[in-house]
Amino acid sequence: DNKYKARIKILVKALTPEVFAQKVEAEFAHTIKTLKVDAETLAKMDENFTPFAYQDYQDQDFTELFAQHPKFKHWFNINTHAHKVKGYRIVTISLKRTGVAPGDVTSEEMNLIADLADQYTFGELRTTHEQNIALVDVPQKDLFALWQALDQANLARAHIGFLTDIICCPGGDFCSLANA
């Protein structure tokens, strides 16, 4: 192991898992006692998170579209999730496919996803810890058009949360930490 790479696995191996766990628990116990955030600090932090100007959309009835387009129904059920605002959904775009390192996306695909974020959301996309991309504020009325654009670009793979949505290291060819 390379001790100059900041990796938890190296620390755990040096300390032993038991000692590492004890140190984590001790730090947590100390932090939970000393961490105090007052209302003024919370209000100041809240100023940094201006809410988007959501439209007053209604939830959509996709019954007819689901009957006509079973692939859309499958994608909707797997790759979209409830949103806190009525009439919106969160869409997860899978970056997993055969023959490509998980999470890899070409510049053309990323430009397309950015354009779709501009067209169908507030211009925001997020990378996820699952090595995917999320469009978090998609109006339900635009889901079918978004799915069609993703499908045309081979980005509408419906396997979020399944074994094929694996999270893994892309290996030494792509990551300097692969051999740490």
Feature locations, PLM:
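Peripheral terminal and linker regions in Fe-S/redox and tRNA-modifying enzymes
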Residues: 1-180
